[in-house]
Regions:
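Hydrophobic transmembrane alpha-helices of multi-pass small-molecule transport proteins
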Residues: 36, 110-129, 178-184
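C-terminal transmembrane-helix exit sites in multi-pass transporters
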Residues: 72, 91-116
Length: 196
């Protein structure tokens, strides 16, 4: 619930910007990347562990974060913010599944019951997705796929961070965001970059 509260203003500003998906990806990525990298560089523990980013697990987490951020941004541009946030809330389900294979953890029954209830909630949200006020006129199905894609890649990145906990997460997310910003910059039409 804390994560949803933190993400809510981000989603609100993204929607208010009325930018296309590539402009949002560019600005959000570059700004978030610079802020997180600068902020994390103020802490000795992040500076000491910086070299751990350059490992197979580190690059895997960067890829997961890039994919998650792309799906999240595209989903926000495509459909209702509530649907994206609701589907994003399924990331612990994916984290539980990935942790079985990567960490060898066993998941208890209460986790699977919670997962089923969350999926029912997503189903209800998707079924009523066309009736949301002020939502973009995009596809609810594509938005749902984007939300689930963002949740799955976020869940995998969290499990990989647990697999190698000495990787500085904040710095890594900043690098991923910066990569997303540069990807958006390569694709966005220059005329659209300053509109919104």
């Amino acid at each position: 619930s804390i994560g949803a509260l933190i993400l809510s203003p981000d989603v609100l500003f993204m929607r208010w910007s009325e930018m296309d998906v590539w402009s949002m990806l560019t600005w959000r990525g570059i700004e978030m990347g610079i802020i997180l990298i600068l902020f994390s560089s103020c802490f000795k523990i992040f500076r000491d562990n910086f070299k751990n980013i350059f490992s197979p697990v580190g690059f895997g987490i960067i890829c997961c974060q890039i994919i998650s951020s792309f799906f999240f941004t595209y989903g926000i541009a495509e459909t209702s913010a509530s649907l994206i946030l609701f589907t994003l809330a399924t990331s612990p389900i994916f984290a539980s599944i990935f942790s079985i294979f990567i960490l060898g953890e066993k998941t208890n029954n209460s986790t699977w019951i919670t997962a089923c209830l969350a999926l029912i909630g997503v189903g209800i949200s998707v079924a009523n997705g066309d009736n949301v006020l002020n939502a973009p006129e995009g596809s609810v199905l594509i938005g749902t796929i984007c939300g689930i894609g963002a949740a799955a890649s976020l869940g995998l990145s969290l499990v990989l961070l647990r697999y190698q906990p000495n990787i500085p997460a904040m710095t890594l997310i900043g690098i991923s965001a910066l990569c997303n910003g540069f990807i958006g910059l390569l694709i966005v039409s220059p005329g659209l970059l300053f509109q919104g």
